[in-house]
């Protein structure tokens, strides 16, 4: 007890109490100390949850400020939609702490560069089908984004064209080329209505041009797919002429397999072949000049060689990509990837220049060309575009670029990269501590069956507590990379749902179908991708708790570097060294889904459930209660008899000890050691 200020003990000191009261007081103090120690131990073991602060207006302002900073950093114009998406990126996902699985995410809100090795056709619509051919762009649906910063990766060299004098590394330079074709004059007095003269059509078109060392005009023979016939066999002279002198020549989808010309991208490997030149090594100007009277005194362009004159029509510049150059003399080459409509997109970057037959002046024709969904054009200044090959991967970055779906003559000073929205990505997600299941009803039934197994009730409780401790311990030592790099399945599911609802898929469906056949085709293609996604979803076993993504039964190896997954999300799909081979991964998911088909025997499961419920019947527990009662009774009897037996045994041992002591004294003194009144004759004991 604390002392008084004067140093004398206080009136409540233990020294002033008598013995009995002092003992009671000390016992009370010891009891209080024990209670305090118990309370302290409980407090130390208690994990108090922090008090959640209510969301205040200051918090919302801070979030909006961070979202605005994200838009400023990415140079994205601030709109309600972009601000909403920026808020989604600012709000941090919950940390990962459980089992990870691969999730199938259809139509993700990301863009990947399209490589020259892409085998999917890129459709291009134009507003000048008379002079460019192809499909018409009736709907005029054009979009242009604000400035964005683009940074992705690609397995192959991305499709890139430079319309400026400056060409980024990995891009192709374009230039104006002359396309010539002649049609017959009209003479009704002649058989077939054809006159003796010819009318020459001159068209200046922007396409792959002569760029010095990057162009080889030496004819090379190549074996093309049967889809591209030889022009001289498939299209004869005047085959499409209908007697109209004002009708321009048609575009012919054919090739000259023995007249291939190769173009090389700046500072990169690979060749782009063009088989649309009838005479790549010989200037046809002299031949035209020698027949000047036949063509109505037509004079070919000055200081410009002519290599694209064909009498049946203008030959479409179908480009074929060769990823790894082989022997140029090898005719049996099958690795050519065709790109049939990209020339129309390049042609729209500048005005078409047309000289009609009999006219001295050239006509300037404005043209626009648009790519269809899911393709988009990334437009930027050449000096702000960087394409670098690191190992087997191409790293593409573009600062202050814009996304658009159409090109016209305003793009003359820019470079363009084709990008697309991938049909799906595979993303590792965490589903927490819950097991993977694809049927909620059966899983709930299993939970109930496990809970009612009477014989495992106590063991389940003990194992459950042990598992909980193990899980908490494993969470405490979880890797930092997994927590920082992987998102939870709930977060990804909600994000994809929000983005899907915010970025509505009604881009084209509202258009009038009766006058927009190409828009309808885009819708059909888009719906086809949706059907493909649904087919994949139906053929894959998915977690039942997530509706907007498909969490597959394939576990994700958390020990793998996150850079491999990041490379896939940035556009690498077929490189096992730095990313995942998505095709192999998809096949593995399909095989596991087939093996994971739920073969639950519902009748057997129901019988098991009924047996478990029957085991909980109190009448069936009577025998267990009887056995427990008999055991308890026997235990009580043993506990009651044990003290008596122990006491008797102790007395017997004391008597034996006394007798031994008396015997030893007699033997030592040779007489009676006990008083006469108490003498007792003991039997003789011999000791050996």
UniProtKB/Swiss-Prot annotation:
InterPro entries: GP41-like, Retroviral_env_glycoprotein
Post-translational modification: Specific enzymatic cleavages in vivo yield mature proteins. Envelope glycoproteins are synthesized as an inactive precursor that is N-glycosylated and processed likely by host cell furin or by a furin-like protease in the Golgi to yield the mature SU and TM proteins. The cleavage site between SU and TM requires the minimal sequence [KR]-X-[KR]-R.
Region Immunosuppression: start-end pairs: 463-481
Site (Cleavage): 454-455
Transmembrane portions of the chain: 625-645
Record-level Gene Ontology MF annotations: structural molecule activity
One GO cellular component term noted in the UniProt record for this chain: host cell plasma membrane
Signal peptide positions on this chain: 1-98
Entry keywords, A to Z: Cleavage on pair of basic residues, Coiled coil, Disulfide bond, Fusion of virus membrane with host cell membrane, Fusion of virus membrane with host membrane, Glycoprotein, Host cell membrane, Host membrane, Host-virus interaction, Membrane, Signal, Transmembrane, Transmembrane helix, Viral attachment to host cell, Viral envelope protein, Viral penetration into host cytoplasm, Virion, Virus entry into host cell
Protein name, per record: Envelope glycoprotein gp70
Organism: Mouse mammary tumor virus (strain C3H) (MMTV)
Gene from which the chain derives: env
């Amino acid at each position: 007890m604390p002392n008084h200020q004067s140093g004398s003990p206080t009136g409540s000191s233990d020294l002033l109490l008598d013995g009995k009261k002092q003992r009671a007081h000390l016992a009370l103090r010891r009891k209080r100390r024990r209670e305090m120690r118990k309370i302290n131990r409980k407090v130390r073991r208690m994990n108090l949850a922090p008090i959640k602060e209510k969301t205040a207006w200051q918090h919302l302002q801070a979030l909006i400020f961070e979202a605005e900073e994200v838009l400023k950093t990415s140079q994205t114009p601030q709109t309600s939609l972009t601000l909403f998406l920026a808020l989604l990126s600012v709000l941090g996902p919950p940390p990962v702490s459980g089992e990870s699985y691969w999730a199938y995410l259809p139509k993700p809100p990301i863009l990947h560069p399209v490589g020259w090795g892409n085998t999917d056709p890129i459709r291009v619509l134009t507003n000048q089908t008379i002079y460019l051919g192809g499909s018409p762009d009736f709907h005029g649906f054009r979009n242009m984004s604000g400035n964005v910063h683009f940074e992705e990766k690609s397995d192959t060299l991305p499709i890139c064209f430079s319309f400026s004098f400056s060409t980024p590394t990995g891009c192709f330079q374009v230039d104006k080329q002359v396309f010539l074709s002649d049609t017959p004059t009209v003479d009704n007095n002649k058989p077939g209505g054809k006159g003796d003269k010819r009318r020459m059509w001159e068209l200046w078109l922007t396409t792959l041009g002569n760029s010095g060392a990057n162009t080889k005009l030496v004819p090379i023979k190549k074996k093309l797919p049967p889809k591209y016939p030889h022009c001289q066999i498939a299209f004869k002279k005047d085959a499409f002429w209908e007697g109209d002198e004002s009708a321009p020549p048609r575009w012919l989808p054919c090739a000259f397999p023995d007249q291939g010309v190769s173009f090389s991208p700046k500072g990169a490997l690979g060749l782009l072949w063009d088989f649309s030149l009838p005479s790549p090594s010989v200037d046809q100007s002299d031949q035209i000049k020698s027949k000047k009277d036949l063509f109505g005194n037509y004079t070919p362009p000055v200081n410009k060689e002519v290599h694209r004159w064909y009498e049946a029509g203008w030959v479409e510049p179908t480009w074929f990509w060769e990823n790894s150059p082989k022997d140029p003399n090898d005719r049996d080459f099958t690795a050519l990837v065709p790109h049939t409509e990209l020339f129309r997109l390049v042609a729209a970057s500048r005005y078409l220049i047309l000289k009609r037959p009999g006219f001295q002046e050239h006509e300037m024709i404005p043209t626009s060309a648009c790519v269809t969904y899911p393709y988009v054009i990334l437009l930027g200044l050449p000096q702000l575009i960087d394409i670098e090959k690191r190992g087997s991967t191409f790293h593409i970055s573009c600062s202050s670029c814009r996304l658009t779906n159409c090109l016209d003559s305003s793009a003359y000073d820019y470079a363009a990269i084709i990008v697309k929205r991938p049909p799906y990505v595979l993303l590792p997600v965490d589903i927490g501590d819950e097991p993977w299941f694809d049927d909620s009803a059966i899983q709930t039934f299993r939970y109930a069956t496990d809970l009612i197994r009477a014989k495992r009730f106590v063991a389940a409780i003990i194992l459950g507590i042990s598992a909980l401790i193990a899980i908490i311990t494993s969470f405490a030592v979880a890797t930092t990379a997994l927590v920082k790099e992987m998102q939870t399945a709930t977060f990804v599911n909600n994000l994809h749902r929000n983005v899907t609802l915010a970025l509505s898929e009604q881009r084209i469906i509202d258009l009038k179908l009766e006058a927009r056949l190409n828009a309808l085709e885009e819708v059909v293609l888009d719906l086809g991708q949706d059907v493909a996604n649904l087919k994949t979803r139906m053929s894959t076993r998915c977690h039942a708790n997530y509706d907007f993504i498909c969490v597959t039964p394939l576990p994700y190896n958390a020990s793998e570097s996150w850079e491999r997954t990041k490379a896939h999300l940035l556009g690498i799909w077929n490189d096992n060294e730095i990313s995942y081979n998505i095709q192999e991964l998809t096949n593995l998911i399909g095989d596991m889904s087939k093996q994971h088909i739920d073969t639950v025997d519902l009748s057997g499961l129901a019988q098991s459930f009924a047996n478990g419920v029957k085991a909980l019947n109190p009448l069936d527990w009577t025998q267990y209660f009887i056995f427990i009662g008999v055991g308890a009774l026997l235990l009580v009897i043993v506990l009651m008899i044990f003290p008596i037996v122990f006491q008797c045994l102790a007395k017997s041992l004391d008597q034996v000890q006394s007798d031994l002591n008396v015997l030893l004294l007699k033997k030592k003194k040779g007489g009676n050691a006990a008083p006469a009144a108490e003498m007792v004759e003991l039997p003789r004991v011999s000791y050996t």
